[in-house]
Amino acid sequence: SDLIPNLFHKLSGQYYYFRDQSKKMFKKEIDNIFEDNDFSSMLNTFFAKRDLEQYAVYNSLAMIDSYFSRLEHILVLALPFSKNNKEYDIKKFIGEFWSKKYSEVFDLNNQDSKRIHDELNLIKEKYRNTFAHGGFEKKGQSFHFHLENYGVVPATMSDYKNSVHFNFTPLNESEFENICLFFDVVDNFFKENLEASWMFCNSGLDLIMDDESLSRLLKKAEDLEVFRNWLDSENERLSNYINAAY
């Protein structure tokens, strides 16, 4: 029978690792040691700060990437719960874009679902896709332009929020914090609106796709308390089996 491995904890671990690394890098202070306003030590401090900021950005982009991988994984594991015995093709679904997956699991006519989808899409287009497409934005352009006496300055010229952004890095600390806050909102939205699916993801149990296993799973999920106890006992049974095998 088809089995879909539950990688929720692995993908969560990856996401939180990059998130913690970014936070540390953004918060890390560089000692300002200016000996008699010595220009070279000022310059060294500037470059050290810039390097830290770059490392924070690398980790932030990896965090965003990891979050979307985890998001798609949750949607795959949630599909049988949201379809509940309706016809669907899980193999085809796995190959779909994240937004198609999202719209299969959530009703985009619902205002909250739509708002979260659109905000995720903005983050995806601005941060994830820019770097997935060789560092070029799909909407708008990535330009560098010359500034008198300063040389070439990176500028992100795009139609996001109809504004022009001038920056040395693709995202800063406050943007990083806002993205983290928003990802937490999305997680809470999932917990509330995909309760059984979220519990299943957290259980770490693999999704077994044969008719008998699936209908038993969905039957148990009709009552969340029953479902929670069942997941616990399945996990216990599995760990006893693994321990006995070794």
Q: What does each of the following model-derived ranges do?
A:
Residues E53-S82:
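Short, hydrophobic, well-ordered secondary-structure elements
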Residues E72-L79, N129-G140, K191:
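Charged/polar positions within long, soluble alpha-helices
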